[in-house]
Amino acid sequence: MKARRTVAAALSVLALTAVAACGKDGSPNTDTAKSGSAAPQLPTYQVNADAKLDGSPVWTEAKKNGKLRIGAKSDQPFLGFEDVQTGKRNGFDIEIAKMIAADLGFSADQIEFKTINSSARETSLSGGQVDYYVGTYSINDNRKKTIDFAGPYYIAGQSLLVNKDNSEITGPESTKGKSVCTVTGSTSVTNIKTYGANVTEFESYSLCVEKLLTKEVDAVTTDDAILKGYAAKNQGKLKVVGNTFSQEKYGVGLKKGDAVLQQAITDALKKHEQNGDWKKAYDATLGLSGADAPSIPDLTEKAAG
């Protein structure tokens, strides 16, 4: 919990730097961010040309097509963001997706990122629209009824985003009767309802933030790292309040029953955590504030049986 609070607090420093490092649409401009000699650099990933996953139908089909389809978010600064002008993706989750892809034998130009809303993640995996999903995807037992996970690769905590002049909401206990916005299908919905909040749901966090800025809702709730990205993007207008009130373990989602692919993704995560790529990816995205990287969680998700 201490590590998560430290990361969340330190990310507020981005409010001083993110605006200068953002493009016209508010997306993090990694070229600008890395212009200084001491700026952290994104890692590079060597493609495993000898990768072979016998027994994985998902990998076999992807290899046959020469393309890996990865589900991701597109509206989360410093996590999963798509520049609407260039189509380029950046953020910590995007780097996690790329390092896994390299170990599976796919180069960056063989990746097709697909924006999948939270409410459609399970169906997109089960239906084969994407090969795996990386996008602040919390591991829970209900989701594991229909899909599998590898990981976790990161641990976050739920918090609240409010307007800068809001002094009434200081934490989840003060949301009773208040209008709180979050994303359809996210674990945040269930968590905040226990405090008596009136929940409004949209398909993306950016829509929730728009409603917050126009004061059509009183707060936005989701994981602290996501909220700090939006606070930085909207410098001087929004703030994150209170301590985290949940533990969210981010995992890589994949089609249920593909144990070979699940193990391969687990092995890739372990490798890149141990060789320093995970830390480099964090430092060049969420860690741009200078905050120390949080502890890397144990990889607990394994194939059944």
Question: Whereabouts are the PLM-identified features?
Answer:
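Bacterial lipoprotein signal-peptidase II cleavage site
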Residues: 18-33
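Short loop->beta-strand "edge-of-pocket" segments that line small-molecule binding or catalytic clefts
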Residues: 68-72, 90, 172-185
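Periplasmic-binding protein-like
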Residues: 155-162, 228-269, 290-305
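Acidic, polar ligand-binding/catalytic clefts
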Residues: 109-174
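A ligand-binding cleft/hinge motif common to bilobed small-molecule-binding domains
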Residues: 137-145, 194, 218-247
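Extended ligand-binding regions for polar small-molecule ligands
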Residues: 23, 35-53, 252-290
